[in-house]
UniProtKB/Swiss-Prot annotation:
Disruption phenotype: The left and right AIM neurons and the left and right RIF neurons are connected by abnormal neurites in 40% and 80% of adults respectively. Fails to reduce chemotaxis to benzaldehyde after pre-exposure to benzaldehyde. In mbr-1 and cam-1 double mutants, normal neurite pruning between left and right AIM neurons is restored. It holds the Pfam family HTH_psq. Residues 145-197, 334-386 form the HTH psq-type domain. SUPFAM superfamilies: Homeodomain-like. This is Mblk-1-related factor 1.
Amino acid sequence: MNSEPKPGLAMSSHFMGTDNQDQYKGTYAMNRLSIANLLNSPSSTLPTGNDFQNFGLERQINEGVLPQLLQNPWAINFWLQFQNAQLQPHLQYAALACSLVTENPLDLSNKTMNMLQKIGVFNSVTKSEDDESVAPEKPVDESLNKSNILRRNYTVEDLTQAVEDIRQGKLGTRRASVVYGIPRSTLRNKIYKLEAEGAIPSKVRRGKIAARRAEAEQKRCVEATAAAALLDAFGNQSDSSSSSPHASMCPSSPDSTNSSLEGTGETPEMSDKKSCSPLDPKWLESIWQNLFKTQGNVVPVDSANISNVDTHTPTPISEKSQKMHGNEEWKRSRPKRGQYRKYDKNALDEAVRSVRRGEMTVHRAGSFFGVPHSTLEYKVKERNLMRKKKDCLYSHDSSTSEDGSQLVTSTISEKSDSSSHTSTPIPFPISLV
């Protein structure tokens, strides 16, 4: 009994042999690896034949080791010490993490990670993160350029082509942004910038405006000359009436015309040739209409005079007949519209009366009398508003009439009072001496 060792005594005299220790460590490591593999392996996979063999070997080893542990209590103590040595870092990390969380629950600084890194549990993880953080940083400009390149889906050539198309009037900003894939704001900013930098667009615009004005003046002069020629051909208007439109349309003296011809290097013959150019039929048609309006009826025309004016211009009667024929064809080809106002005015009045009396609703009266509901509702509202206005006017007139009658009665009463005062004789005492 005394020879048995006590479990509480020191283990100095009861160390296991080196072979037993190595065997125990090997089995322990194999058990830990198998548990880790089981935890890491997905649940859906089934164990293979090799796994069954490994399980069998581990079972045999455990069956061989467990009796030794039960027979030798010092082996159990060594096993517990080994487990504590393996779990000590994890326990320290858990205690430190709990203390940090309880002290500073919202501390997101690097202090906590530095404290945790003092323990050698996460050294590998921190080393890998440090290696990634030490990677050479790229300059900021390159990152910005990359972001700009990713944003831009167009080239500089597309931008210039789009701006040219917008300037020439081929495309608008909206259509150009869709065709070239450029934002509309970018196109606008580019156009504004180019207009602010160079004065070429303003000069071009001024030249276009001047050219348009010159064309308009030339058209007016041609109209005036055609009108004067037609009036001379008819002979119904006086010279003053024929010269006045010419002067009003082309206010230019002969001296000014000669100077202008000399400045441009043209001769009067060339200008006469230009003025005798074939006229536009639209202008002639407008002139004919104005002449017929002034004269009232159709005037007989000399064929010789009109042929002298212009042999290629068609007669107004033929033009009008062609126009009327074209209008008739257009009217025939046009699809027939829907018939509006199929209801009668009396039906509308009856429907309005029935709605205002409360006999029917708007919907029922409209369907009964064949009147659109919107029209009926509008008419009922209009009648109600008119009645309100009439009531207001009547009340105002009645109030004014009552006020006037009160004033008249008050003045009459005042006059009667004054007359009564004046008519009553004042008694004076008469003394007879």
